[in-house]
């Protein structure tokens, strides 16, 4: 079994699960997942986790995500993107003043609550919201805490006088679980206008950049796909690591506690024979297992 991550540049037209399914076949193992869904129309960085690395998703997701895209002012759809049905249109006579757009962008900076859209993979009562949305149903959802570190226009906007619409390129840096589609619709609401997402690309996630990702087709066509795997030992570089000897290893591989470590930090990556085998956290004077990754494979 392979353990580690693969940085995939997801093309438009595929769901995140489609990519996972293809890589399960390529690597011939079931234990394959990802750290954050991308909608079918969205391109960019999809971090695929293999084997024991699936246990590290929570740690990987702690890093921010960055997107670049284009939004439309003057148009609104039921899916908040161009895949849906138009639900509202408002003809703009002229482009919105830059200072008004900046004020609207800036108003989202910081922490806030965001209501997940009906067209999303969030589960309520065992069903995905998008399954209910496709039936025309709208149900009550719980808002989620999000944080927006950056949300601003990039370059000049384009105004189409014939359509009465304005197209704005933007960049957004956000916490996990933030829906950019919803952010855009809310941005339009701040201006008193319908708005929807035209295109979107994820350029950073979990501490990695799309510049270092691999085109999906290249991975699928490769005779040696394992060369694209970033091994477990290179993951979570900001966490301190400690290499144990054979005595401590006998305790660790059975989930045992450790009294003391030469480094007084927590959490800590535990290595044995140069392999990343566990994450321990200090509790009540002892180092206790938080994530067990015991493996001898790739």
Curated annotation (Swiss-Prot):
GO biological process: mRNA pseudouridine synthesis; tRNA pseudouridine synthesis
NCBIfam families (alphabetical): TruB
Catalytically driven reaction(s): uridine(55) in tRNA = pseudouridine(55) in tRNA
Entry similarity comment: Belongs to the pseudouridine synthase TruB family. Type 1 subfamily.
Protein name per UniProt: tRNA pseudouridine synthase B
Keywords carried by this UniProt record: Isomerase, tRNA processing
Record GO terms (molecular function): RNA binding; tRNA pseudouridine(55) synthase activity
Species this protein is from: Oenococcus oeni (strain ATCC BAA-331 / PSU-1)
EC code: 5.4.99.25
């Amino acid at each position: 079994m392979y353990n580690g991550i693969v940085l995939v540049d997801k093309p438009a037209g595929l769901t995140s699960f489609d990519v996972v399914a293809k890589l399960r076949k390529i690597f011939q193992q079931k234990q394959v997942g990802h750290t954050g869904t991308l909608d079918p129309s969205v391109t960019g960085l999809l971090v695929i986790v293999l084997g024991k690395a699936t246990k590290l998703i929570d740690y990987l997701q702690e890093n921010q995500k960055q997107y670049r895209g284009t939004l439309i002012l003057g148009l609104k759809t039921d899916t908040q993107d161009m895949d849906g049905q138009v639900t509202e249109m408002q003809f703009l006579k002229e482009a919105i003043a830059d200072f008004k757009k900046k004020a609207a962008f800036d108003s989202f900076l910081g922490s806030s609550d965001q209501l997940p859209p009906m067209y999303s993979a969030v589960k309520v009562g065992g069903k995905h919201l998008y399954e209910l949305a496709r039936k025309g149903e709208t149900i009550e959802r719980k808002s989620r805490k999000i944080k927006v570190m950056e949300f601003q226009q990039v370059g000049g906007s384009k105004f189409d006088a014939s359509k009465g619409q304005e197209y704005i390129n933007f960049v957004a840096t956000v916490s996990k679980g933030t829906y950019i589609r919803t952010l855009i619709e809310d941005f339009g609401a701040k201006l008193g206008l319908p708005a929807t997402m035209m295109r979107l690309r994820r350029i950073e996630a979990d501490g990695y950049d799309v510049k270092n990702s691999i085109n999906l087709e290249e991975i699928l066509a490769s005779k040696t796909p394992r060369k694209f795997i970033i091994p477990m030992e290179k993951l979570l570089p900001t966490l301190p690591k400690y290499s144990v000897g054979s005595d401590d290893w006998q305790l660790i591989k059975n989930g045992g506690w450790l009294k003391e470590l030469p480094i007084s930090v927590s959490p800590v990556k535990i290595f044995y024979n140069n392999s990343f085998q566990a994450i321990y956290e200090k509790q009540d004077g002892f180092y206790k297992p938080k994530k067990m990754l015991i493996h001898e494979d790739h």
